[in-house]
Amino acid sequence: DKREGSGDLLAGLPLWVCKTVGGTTVHWAGASLRFLEHEFKAKSAYGNIEGANLLDWPVDLNEMERFYSMAEDKMGTTGTHGIPRLPGNNNFKVMEYGAKALGYTDVHTGNMSINSQPRDGRPGCHQIGFCMAGCAIGAKWSTLYTEIPAAEATGRFELRSEAMVLKINHNKQGKATGVVYVDADGNTHEQKARVVAIAGNAVETPRVLLNSESSMFPDGMANSSGQVGKNFMRHMTGTVYGTMPGDVHFDRGTQMAGIVMDEVKNDPNRGFVGGYYMQTLPGFGVAAIAGNIGAMSVDSPGKWGRNYTQEVVENYKNMAGMWLVGEDMPQEKNGVTLHGSDKDQYGLPIPKVHFEDHANDVAMRNHAFKAGSNVYAAGGSKKQYQLPPFPSTHNMGTCRMSAN
C-alpha cells in the first residue's frame, strides 16, 4: 500500500505488517515478552526526558499479570505454565557462549509462542526456520489457524477478507454504530454493529479514526485529546552480525529463540534510560544481507563485487546474527497524518508517517552495538557488522491510552 515516510524513515516506508487473514500474527516471530514493572510507569521511572512525551499507563503489572498468564496459556508460550523452552540452534549457542564469557547470566531461548511440544492440536516446532514467512506446520501461534477456524466452526462467525473500511459511523451521542467498507469486488457496504473493534496496527488504526471525521468529530473520531496518530514508535533496534570461526548456518532452526536479558534493566548510569534485549536473528538470505550490510554498514564490503563476495557470500554459513531491541521514546512530532492530496485506490488520503530518533534511542543503540559486537568477539569472531534499524517493524503508539 502506498504511504509516505519522512524523518529517519525511508521515503516509501516499507512497514512490516501483514495485510492478510491472520494479520501480523502470520508474520511475527513469536517472541512473547511481558512489560517490566517500571515500563508501565515510564514517566515516573524515567522522569522528565527532554523531547519525550512520556506518560504512565493507567494499569500496572500487578493488574495485567492474570491477562498475561491467560494469553501465554492460550498461545502456548514457552517458559510459562510448565511449557518447556525451545531448544537452541547454532545461532543461539554462539550468542550464549559469548554472552556467558562476558558475564551475562540471564541467557536462554526466551518466551516464544511456538510449540516446543505438541499442544492445543498443533505440532511441536520442526526447526524449519524462516518463521516470519509463516509457519508451514502451525507450531507458531497465529489466529490464522487457531482462533479464526475455531470461530468459523461455531457457525456464528463470518470472515470477509480483502475488505477495506472507509470510515466508522456514529449516532447523535457519538457512539460508533457500524462501518462503511469496500469489499473484494469494489462494492461499498454499510455494516451496522453494536460494537466496533479497531485493530489495524499503528498506521491503519489512526488512519481510519482520522478518516472518520464528522461535524461532531472534526479532528477525527476519538481524538478529543489531539493525540490520535501521534507518538509513533518502532522500538530502538539495530542488528549485529558476526563472522564466526566455524559453521553456524544461522538460517536453520527457530529464528528468534535466543535472548540475553541482562541489559533490559533501567540504569541511567549507562547514558540512557530504559533497557534493551539482545535476540537471535537469522539471515534473510544473501540478497537481504547485500541490501543491509552492503548498503548500510559503516565498514561496508559493498553491495556487490569481490569484497562483498569474499566477506559475505563466502562466509555466509559462518555468520551469526542478533537483533537489538529496546524501548524508544514517544515523541509528539513522530506520528501518522493524512496526506493532503495523494489518495489510495479507495479514494482515501494515504498515510504520512514521520519518525525521528530521540537522543535516548541513539545512546541506547550505540551501547547495544558495542555490547552485541563484544558478545561475538568473545565467541571468536574477528569481524562484526553493525546495521542501522530496519525501516519499521514493531509499529507502536498512535492511539495512546491514559487514565483520562
Q: What residue spans do the PLM features occupy?
A:
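FAD cofactor-binding and catalytic pocket of flavoenzymes
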Residues: 2-24, 39, 48, 57-60, ...
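A glycine-rich dinucleotide-binding beta-alpha-beta segment and adjacent secondary-structure elements
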Residues: 108-110, 123-131, 166-171, 317-328, ...
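Cytochrome P450 core scaffold surrounding the K-helix E-X-X-R motif
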Residues: 36-45, 170, 207, 335
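N-terminal accessory/precursor segments of enzymes
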Residues: 22-47, 190
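Conserved redox-cofactor binding core of oxidoreductases
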Residues: 5-11, 36-39, 44-165, 391
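Short, solvent-exposed loop/turn and secondary-structure capping segments
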Residues: 29-31, 39-40, 118-120, 207-212
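Glycine-rich loop(s) and the adjacent beta-strand/alpha-helix scaffold that form part
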Residues: 154, 163, 167-173, 179-252
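Generic, well-ordered alpha-helical scaffold segments in large soluble proteins
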Residues: 67-74, 98, 102, 154, ...
